[in-house]
């Protein structure tokens, strides 16, 4: 058994531990959402504080990006990620002992830092520890599994709270976090030489400046962040569109989200199982028409035959499938088609993505309340069309980088 563990630690148990950590982080929001009103009532707090459980979680996710990337470049990926898993576990456990809404929200913000550790350090380690094609396929598998959480989380949470107190849900998540912590401690490989670069404010600022001056990174960050807009704006505003304006029940609304997340899961499964080389430009360009057809359905369908949810869900799901086919490759290209410190590149990319997502959600919300469904969907269409041009720029820069590397080897 010890020999089997040693042989498969990096290739099997490390990805499993990371998936469990990522899955638990998602569940900490999705599992409690159906009972968030119960939380507010237990603490005799104002119901207007309910959305803060999500917004503060996201704020925690943005708080440490600037630090963790450069830090992991200098002291190693492993100590940073296992520290993050431990912090997440303790924050979930502490939630069981909260006695006020303020304490609960502080715990939620600390739990949100898991986004920083996973996205900035965990995903980079996967890409560094495995070859290009295997790394992309493994990330596709991780994404497929983790995206099950937004589908089953609310349904499972609602069912469990018929039998247990909401604090028990955080106990379950804390156990998952602890198991992932132990798994990462025992199985995570170290992909960075520790102490190779000293940690100083000057060197960190220099690294960030170099990243944001790199044109390949800028094209990659623009492509990825703009690609998120159609899905994230829909996920954020769809409750208002479908429940408040459309009259759907909460259970009906929950089922309308399944095709969107399910499309990404199916796309990632196809990449992991059937696509031999997901970095092939021809494969990448074949996914673009699928995205554009989905975006066209958002407008044309609602113009010709308006429906409460059909065209919006169908168009967004088709777009999600198309972009899901190439998302892992876009991340790989942006992170590794340069000679910059990967932790800093990952941190910079995540900061851009979160900023664009936040702004796009607010723009989408404004367009819906001031213009209605068609102006709201036009935001997705505009973002999707711009992505075609930024993707062309990214692939061109990647080709130049690969040609330069070949020339150096010869």
From Swiss-Prot:
It is found in: Cell inner membrane. GO terms for cellular component: plasma membrane. It is a multi-pass membrane protein. Keywords: Antibiotic resistance, Antiport, Cell inner membrane, Cell membrane, Membrane, Transmembrane, Transmembrane helix, Transport. Residues 1-11, 70-78, 125-140, 189-216, 273-282, 329-348, 395-410 are cytoplasmic. Belongs to the major facilitator superfamily. NCBIfam families: PRK15403.1. This is Multidrug resistance protein MdtM. It comes from Escherichia coli O157:H7. The lineage of its organism: Bacteria, Pseudomonadati, Pseudomonadota, Gammaproteobacteria, Enterobacterales.
